[in-house]
Each structure stands twice: as structure tokens, then as C-alpha cells.
Amino acid sequence: MSSWNEAWDRGKQMVGEPLAKMTAAAASATGAAPPQQMQEEGNENPMQMHSNKVLQVMEQTWIGKCRKRWLLAILANMGFMISFGIRCNFGAAKTHMYKNYTDPYGKVHMHEFNWTIDELSVMESSYFYGYLVTQIPAGFLAAKFPPNKLFGFGIGVGAFLNILLPYGFKVKSDYLVAFIQITQGLVQGVCYPAMHGVWRYWAPPMERSKLATTAFTGSYAGAVLGLPLSAFLVSYVSWAAPFYLYGVCGVIWAILWFCVTFEKPAFHPTISQEEKIFIEDAIGHVSNTHPTIRSIPWKAIVTSKPVWAIIVANFARSWTFYLLLQNQLTYMKEALGMKIADSGLLAAIPHLVMGCVVLMGGQLADYLRSNKILSTTAVRKIFNCGGFGGEAAFMLIVAYTTSDTTAIMALIAAVGMSGFAISGFNVNHLDIAPRYAAILMGFSNGIGTLAGLTCPFVTEAFTAHSKHGWTSVFLLASLIHFTGVTFYAVYASGELQEWAEPKEEEEWSNKELVNKTGINGTGYGAAETTFTQLPAGVDSSYQAQAAPAPGTNPFASAWDEHGSSGVVENPHYQQW
């Protein structure tokens, strides 16, 4: 732990000076008043001070006026957009790596590399080996540590690694490229589970679909922007341009994310009391204790039919999503005879339609639930099975039509219909087990990632010798979705599972530890230790509630990471 703290302190010192210049420029541009001195002279923390300045400047813009839970959703949307845009870079760049090509200006370019399409497919899919490995561990980490920091770490480091990828290509080292891809997958594998961990504290039950789908729509918006932008940059600038652009954007986003997001409403220094009370009252008692490896009901999770319904649905959706993300431009080039520069924008339309459907579906799903028109279980099943059923049907049309126009229209309709399913399986974890939502997301997304691993090889096997192999590719995608529809319709549930809450003795044991020592047993700060229920026979003198110290500077306290022994008095205290 000491080595981690030393590394963290060194990191603060390294970023302190450039962050100071950035915040000074922002303050000058907005006319913000200089903040109060955050710490005593001689004990200054550069990163804390300048992050507080950034937060104060942001509070004078639209960010300060935005409800904090929706600010989280919007920034998360941008983060997912960058993350999934990064995944489009390789697919666009590889089309110029293994054969000669003519750019839009008529100039013929000789390919720079001697790799075959098979070798490039292996390097591209290596991302998913890393992505798969961190799924279940990421779910546990997101339940154990502040999930907002974990999410920012995944996007920021993944973006930085994207900047390094062109170097691996230029030195013509397939091992280095594969290593960077695997490492990218490792760090970005934490993002989905971490975001589910964030919504555990920030999403009121009747807003779960809206908030979660707003955030996750970034995944599909990432493809909407990433496919045409990557194709444009590869065609008009260079094959390395998309890697650099997305890498820089991701690093900038990560800095903003760390400055303005917090683990819980109680930790946020500038959230309105109205919003804070609304969220906490709606969610109810959220345990301050966090699961340990021994306390997680692994057997119940693995044997739960509703959990497996989510997993099967996740795999089905992942199969088609990665199929299109990795091969849509290739399909349009080989099967439909389109140029890469021309097909980029057209390839984005299905994902654009899906993004719109996801947002509308989230609003409609929560409307049906909040007005008690349908039960949560009914909403999840109808949206998931309707979306997947429509996608499977249109995929059959794509597989067997001989008209290019019909194929494109059916592909747009298929991907668009799948948007309804996001209000089904993709938020279902929060319904059945909010305490373990991050872990369930890691579990289901990990198995779903197998689709990303196997899809490139299956597609290559079908299409290696003839463009007619694309019929088999889309037929298989349709059958996988019909399987997902059937399984989810039979076994899915929207009700809280009996194993989803901790046992009373585990809950009380951790609460008593917090009360007596003032230190959260999870290893990071938590101040709002309000105990509303006590086990029978326990003296009421154990009931306690930590209160903020009077006069606490909310900006300074929000970044205070050096807790002292004894009761934590700072309501915004958070420690990694």
C-alpha cells in the first residue's frame, strides 16, 4: 500500500504544474475568482489544489447548473464514445496495411507492411484477450474501490496506449502491437463493470433505464462517429491519424472526469441538497460495507437463471456488435463493392439509428415502470425479446438478399431494433442485484467478450474464399439472436433476488467496525455511516452518524486523500 501511495504522490507532483496552467487559463477565460487557499502553507498538494480550481471554474459553466447524476451520464457517454471509437481505428487502418490502395486524390500507395489479413486479424482480436481477463476482477474491484475512479482509469490509460500503437506498427513488430492491444483490453475491460458500480449510488430506481442508457449510448455513438471518422482519416490523412486523435481526446477527457465526478452524492462538494436527498431517499439504505471475495454469493450467482439470461443476451448482442465493428467496412467493400472512403458514413447510419432507439427505449421503459403500466420483469422481457427478435429477422434479410440497397436498409433496421434490448438485459443487473451489479456486469460482459474473440476467426473462415460467405456470417448472427430471445423470455426476471443482499450478521459486523474505529472496513473513506436498523438485542448506544466538521471547505475536502485515525468527520472524504 505504501508503494501505491508513493506512486500516487509522485503522479500528483508530475501533473500539478501543467494542470495549474490549464486551470489558470480557464479561470482567466471565465472570469472566475481565485479560490481560497486549500491547505496550510508548506503542506500544499498540487494536484488537489489545481483540481479544486478546475472544479470551481467548471461550477460557473453549464456543468455547475447541470444535475450531477445527469452530468455523470453525459460524461460517461463521452467516455464510452471514445473507448468504442478506439476500437474502430484498427478496423479502418488494416484495410491499408495489407494491400496497395488508391487514395481519393487518385494517388496509388504501396502498402508498408508484409502482414497478411490473417495476421492482422489475430493482432486486432488480441485486444479481447485482455478485455476478457479483467471482466470478473473488474466487477469485484468496482465493488471494492471507488468505481468512478476505476472508470476514468480505464478510459484514460487505454487512450494513452492508443497513442503508442502506431509505433508498434512502424517498427513492424506484431508482438509489440499484440502486447499493446492486450494491455488496452486489460485496462478498458473495467469500464462497463465500473459504470454499473457508479449507478449503484447515483441512479434512483425509476431512473435507472434513462441514466444507464444515456451513458451506454456512448458505446454506439462511438461507432457512429468512429467508423466514418476513422475511414476519413485513414483515406485523407494517414493510417496512423485515428490512433493519435482518439488517444489525445481520451487523455483530455480523463482529466476532466477526475476533476468533476465523485463516488457518491454524499461525497460531492457542490451537489444541491435537493438532488442529494432525492437520490438517497429514492435508493434507500445503500450499505457502506462492500463485498469481499468470501462474502460474495458465487454459487447463487453462477446457478441463477436470471443471471444466465443476461449472460446469453449479452453474448448475442456482443456477437453482432463486434461483427459490425470489426468487419462492416470490409463487408461493404468486398460484398457490396463500395470504397472505404465512401462507405464510412454509410456504415455509421445503423449505429446512429440504434443510439436514437436506445435513448427513446430508456425513456419509454422507465415510463412504463414508474406509472405501473407494466412490471419491471415484463418491461425487460418485452424490450429485450422485441429488440433481438426484430434484429434476428432483419439479419436473415441481409443474409439472403441480392440487392445492395435492401441489404443496407435491412442492416440499418436490424441494428436499430437492437437498441430496444439495451433497456432489457443491459440494465437488468441493477434490478436483480444492485449490490453486485458491477460483479454481474463483469461476469456477463466477460462471457460476451468471447464473441469478440471468436467472431473474427469465424468470419474469416466463412469469407476467405468467396464473398458469398457473408450469407453464412449473417445467418449465424441471426440464429444466435433467436437463441438469445428464447432463453431470455423463459428465464429473465426484474425482481430483486433473495441472495442479492448481505446477511444481517455480515452487515452488522462491518457497521460495528466503522462505528468503533471510524474507519470503513472497505479500505477507503465513507462518512455517511447512518445506521437505521440494529439487530435485535443490540444496545442503541451503538447507533451513530458522522457529521461534517463545521467550516469545512468542500473543494478541499473533496480531494482530501490523507485520512487520519479516528472518526472521519469529512463528508466528502474519499480515498483510493
From Swiss-Prot:
Disruption phenotype: Defective preference between different food odors. Abnormal repetitive turning behavior during male mating. Residues 36-46 have a biased composition (Polar residues). The keyword Transferase does not apply. Residues 1-69, 143-150, 196-213, 261-305, 366-381, 428-437, 493-576 are cytoplasmic. SUPFAM superfamilies: MFS general substrate transporter (SSF103473). One of its GO terms (molecular function) is L-glutamate transmembrane transporter activity. InterPro entries: MFS, MFS_dom, MFS_Na/Anion_cotransporter, MFS_trans_sf. Glycans are attached at residues 100, 114. Residues 91-121, 172-174, 235-239, 326-344, 403-406, 459-471 are extracellular. It holds the Pfam family MFS_1. The keyword Transmembrane helix applies. It is a multi-pass membrane protein. Keywords: Cell membrane, Glycoprotein, Ion transport, Membrane, Neurotransmitter transport, Sodium, Sodium transport, Symport, Synapse, Transmembrane, Transmembrane helix, Transport. It is found in: Cell membrane; Synapse. GO terms for biological process: adult locomotory behavior; hyperosmotic response; L-glutamate transmembrane transport; negative regulation of turning behavior involved in mating; neurotransmitter loading into synaptic vesicle; positive regulation of backward locomotion; positive regulation of male mating behavior; regulation of nematode pharyngeal pumping. Expressed in neurons of the pharynx and the extrapharyngeal nervous system. Highly expressed in male PHC sensory neurons. The chain crosses the membrane at residues 70-90, 122-142, 151-171, 175-195, 214-234, 240-260, 306-325, 345-365, 382-402, 407-427, 438-458, 472-492. Residues 25-46 are annotated as: Disordered. Required for glutamatergic synaptic transmission. In AWB and AWC sensory neurons, required for the detection of preferred food sources, probably via glutamatergic neurotransmission from sensory neurons. Negatively regulates the turning step of male mating behavior. This is Probable vesicular glutamate transporter eat-4. It comes from Caenorhabditis elegans.
